[in-house]
Amino acid sequence: MDKQTRVSNVTLRPIGQDDLELIFTHQQDPIASQLAQFPSREREAFYLHWQQNILGQASVLARGIEVDGLLVGNIGHWHMDGQAMIGYWIDRAFWGRGVATLTLSAFLPLVNSRPLFAHVAQHNVASQRVLLRHGFVKMDRLIQEENDTAPLFEFVLA
């Protein structure tokens, strides 16, 4: 598929143990990790995190993002420090094709929590645009999360 080809449809589905190896590979991409401003986890830490904090938590809504039957990323909703959060990760091969926009359009109706927060790297302009397009508002404060390498912009959907 040509890098410039826009994606016309995404499918969201539950994430299973069999998906973790590909999700692990996605988060190992150094360019994606730098853009997300989130360091990649080593294999053991990654699997432990996903099994205990994501797949093992009934309060977490995690979905795989598929394009034409191929798992190209994941999106999730969880609570952190009393805030309802949302975040996603998309395989770099699918950047710039509208996957994030379609994914948020499909995922937001599944999340009833409001306000809903997202934290985005200051240099990740594409993700900032996707959030703004979906009604999120950029707040006038920076957030420093535990694993992040620098402060992040905070966005909120009321």
What are these regions (language model features)?
Residues N53-S59:
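Short loop/turn motifs at secondary-structure junctions and domain boundaries
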Residues I31-Q51:
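Conserved GNAT-fold acetyl-CoA-binding loop/helix
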Residues M1-P30, L35, A62-A158:
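Acyl-donor (CoA/ACP) binding surface of acyl/acetyltransferases
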